[in-house]
Amino acid sequence: MTVSETLAALKTQKGIEPKASYTGTEDTDDFIFAVQTDSSSQTKESAWIVCADHVKEHSGALNATTADEAFIRTGTVTSKTGTQRTFSINGNRCVGDDFQDFALSHKIKYGTGSDVIVPYIYFSIRTGKGESGSAVLIVNSDVGGAANASATFAMDVKAVGTPVEFDYLEANPQSNTDTAKPVKA
C-alpha cells in the first residue's frame, strides 16, 4: 500500500488526517515508515510503499556517538559527535505485501553496498511532520517461528548520514485541509 492510499484509508475509516495544528498524544500506530522501492515509478513520496501489513513493530531509535576527553582541572567531558537513526522492524510474513516482497527479496537479503540503500520517510499521521533520508536495509531473519506458528521476519534499518526534516503537508499541498495556523512548540 502506498503512503497516499494509507492516508486515504485512515481518513475514511478513522477520520484521521495530518493537520499542522494537531496537539495531543500520539500512539505507535500514528507513525508511517515508507520506502521508495522503484525510483522510476515512485517519483513522489506519496507513492512510496508503507511498512505496515502484518508488521508488529517499526520502532525508531536514535543512537548517539560520543567521545570522552579529559581536561586539566575540568575532568572528563563527553562530547556528542553524531547520531544515527535506526529502526527495528519485525512482524509476520505476508506474501503479496509490497513492502515485505521488496524488503525480503533476494536482492535485499543478500545485497551489499548501494544495492541495499533506499530512500525513506518516517512521519506522524497526526501532524505530517517527520524525517526523510536514505537507509540501509538489513534483514536479520527472513523466516522465524516455532511449529504451528506464523512465520516471522525481522530487520534493521540504519540511516545513511543525517536525515532531513520532512513535512508531508508541504510535500503534498493538496493533502493539507487544515485551515488553522500551526502551533509553535
Model-identified regions with their sequence ranges:
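Viral virion structural and adsorption modules
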Residues: 1-5, 158, 162-185
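Solvent-exposed edge beta-strands and adjacent loop segments
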Residues: 2-90, 136-151
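Acidic-enriched, low-complexity/disordered segments with a strong bias for Aspartate over Glutamate
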Residues: 27-30, 38, 53, 68, ...
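Extracellular/virion structural assembly segments
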Residues: 70-134, 164-174, 184
